[in-house]
């Protein structure tokens, strides 16, 4: 029944929105046929939802049922508009054409409206009973009707009592007279017959009447058996085999199974949620952290090194980072306009001409009165119906349930439903951690900036130059890591740079002193070398001493 109703819902959507707009329903009779069809679908969905014991199917079925009810009310409201605002719509001719009875138009009230609120209604009744008992208030049916009027005088009261008493006595005399008349008639009939029955004769007459009744009943039973044997009369129903009684018992059993399966489903949600968090929570956390860290690096300012602000929780937090929204139409138009700026002047001129022509056309057409927009039926519940149909097709249409005879919950479907919930909870936790991390990074950047500004201020005040001995030690450490033939350009607080090379390689490097393969400087291409012309400069005070025994330095 559920499958049939969902297929009919899909057919209804296609009938309301056909590919050819000319075939769309327009007049009242067409919408009335669609309304009746929705009523039939709603009745099927309501029956299926009431009898279904699978907890997950009941959830999806209820979504489809509520969407169908909403769409039916939308069509009903639209039919009232087409009927010139009259709420009563005559659908007799349409029922005759469709060969349906008037009971089709009765809107059934879904049973879950009362069943889901049973506890609430019971609590309300108990509360009202407690209030009535507390304040000793009697119900309206038990309270006597008191008519307040002018008080009677003593004489009037006596006359009224006497009148009522005379009426009672007259009614009693009439009853006794009727009894006496009946007895007199019986005696007169006996006298006219002239025969007085004895006790034996009276007993024989009674026996004859009883025997006649018994034989007539026996013959009637035999006649009924004959008719049942030839198939002219149905057999009497056994109360134990009554189909209505069996249906009622089956309904009660299904309701009991519904409660049991629903209770098991609620318990499974709690247990499976913990398992999903335990098995897949760490992977979810790492995925979120990786994407947020990549966003930090991508959005960091390359010039200042500042990090962006983390989105507020009210704006969704990292949800926009994990699932960035698609570009809007305005941004696409801006990008297209930016690409069009590189075109020639002709393109600009044409655009200007078109821009000038459009306002003129608008001005010419401005004299016409705006046409009233055509009213359309509401379509609020159509997306809900489409989503319900798609969910049914994707989840239940081709699902093999041969192993689920008792129609209990499906653990895999429960996990699929719980993964987004667990992911959202972990995302909120990671957001809090990443906010703390981002604040620490910002504080670190601010500290580095403040340190740089402090060093610059000290240099401006005239800080003493570092001693040459410290530079010598650092140069020796760096020189040990160099490959043969590499050069080191000393930069820092020394007044002049020095080129260093090992003594045994000085002769090989001395032929092109200060020149590399390109002739621009010592060292391999891509390594640090001396500045052009630095080797030709003469130092004041003569040649410097070598830094060590194994290294020679020259300017």
Curated annotation (Swiss-Prot):
What Gene3D superfamilies does this protein map onto? 1.20.5.190
Q: Where in the cell is it found?
A: Cytoplasm, Cytoskeleton, Flagellum axoneme
Q: Where is the composition biased (Basic and acidic residues)?
A: 235-244, 338-367, 501-521
* Biased composition annotated in UniProt, kind: Basic residues: 452-464, 537-546
Q: Which InterPro entries match?
A: IQ_motif_EF-hand-BS (IPR000048), N-DRC_Component (IPR052267)
Q: What is its main location?
A: cytoplasm
User: Protein name, please?
Assistant: Dynein regulatory complex protein 11
This chain's source organism reads Chlamydomonas reinhardtii
């Amino acid at each position: 029944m559920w499958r049939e109703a969902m297929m009919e819902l899909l057919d209804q959507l296609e009938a309301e929105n056909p590919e050819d707009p000319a075939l769309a329903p327009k007049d009242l009779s067409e919408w009335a046929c669609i309304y009746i069809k929705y009523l039939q679908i709603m009745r099927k969905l309501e029956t299926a939802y009431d009898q279904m014991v699978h907890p997950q199917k009941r959830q999806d079925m209820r979504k489809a049922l509520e969407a169908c009810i909403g769409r039916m009310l939308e069509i009903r409201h639209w039919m009232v508009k087409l009927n010139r605002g009259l709420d009563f719509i005559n659908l007799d001719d349409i029922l005759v054409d469709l060969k349906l009875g008037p009971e089709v138009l009765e809107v059934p009230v879904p049973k879950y409206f009362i069943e889901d609120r049973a506890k609430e209604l019971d609590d309300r009744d108990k509360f009202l009973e407690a209030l009535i008992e507390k304040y000793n208030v009697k119900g309206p049916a038990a309270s006597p009707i008191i008519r307040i009027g002018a008080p009677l005088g003593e004489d009037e009261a006596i006359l009224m009592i006497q009148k009522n008493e005379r009426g009672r006595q007259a009614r009693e005399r009439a009853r006794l007279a009727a009894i006496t008349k009946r007895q007199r008639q019986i005696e007169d009939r006996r006298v006219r017959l002239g025969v007085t029955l004895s006790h034996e004769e009276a007993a024989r007459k009674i026996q004859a009447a009883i025997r006649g009744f018994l034989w007539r009943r026996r013959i009637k039973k035999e006649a009924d058996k004959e008719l049942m044997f030839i198939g002219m009369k149905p057999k009497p129903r056994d109360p134990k085999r009554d189909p209505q009684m069996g249906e009622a018992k089956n309904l009660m059993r299904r309701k009991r199974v519904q409660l049991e399966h629903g209770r098991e489903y609620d318990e499974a949600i709690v247990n499976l949620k913990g398992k999903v968090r335990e098995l897949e929570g760490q992977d979810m956390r790492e995925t979120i952290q990786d994407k947020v860290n990549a966003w930090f690096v991508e959005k960091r300012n390359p010039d200042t090194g500042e990090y962006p602000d983390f989105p507020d929780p009210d704006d969704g937090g990292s949800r926009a980072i994990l699932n960035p929204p698609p570009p809007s139409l305005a941004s696409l138009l801006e990008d297209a306009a930016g690409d069009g700026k590189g075109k020639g002047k002709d393109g600009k001129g044409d655009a200007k001409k078109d821009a000038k022509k459009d306002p003129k056309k608008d001005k010419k057409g401005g004299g016409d009165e705006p046409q009233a927009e055509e009213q359309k039926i509401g379509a609020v519940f159509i997306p809900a119906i489409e989503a319900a149909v798609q969910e049914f097709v994707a989840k239940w249409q081709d699902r093999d349930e041969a192993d689920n005879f008792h129609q209990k919950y499906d653990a895999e479907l429960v996990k699929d439903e719980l993964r987004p919930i667990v992911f959202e909870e972990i995302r909120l936790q990671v957001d809090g951690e990443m906010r703390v991390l981002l604040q620490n990074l910002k504080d670190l950047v601010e500290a580095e900036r403040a340190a740089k500004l402090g060093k610059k201020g000290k240099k401006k005040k005239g800080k003493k130059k570092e001693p040459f001995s410290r530079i010598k030690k650092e140069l020796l450490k760096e020189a040990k890591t160099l490959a043969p033939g590499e050069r080191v350009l000393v930069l820092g607080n020394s007044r002049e740079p020095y080129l260093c090379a090992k003594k045994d390689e000085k002769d090989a490097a001395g032929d092109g002193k200060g020149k590399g393969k390109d002739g621009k400087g010592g060292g391999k291409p891509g390594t640090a070398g001396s500045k052009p012309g630095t080797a030709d400069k003469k130092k004041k005070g003569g040649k410097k001493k070598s830094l060590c025994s194994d290294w020679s330095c020259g300017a």
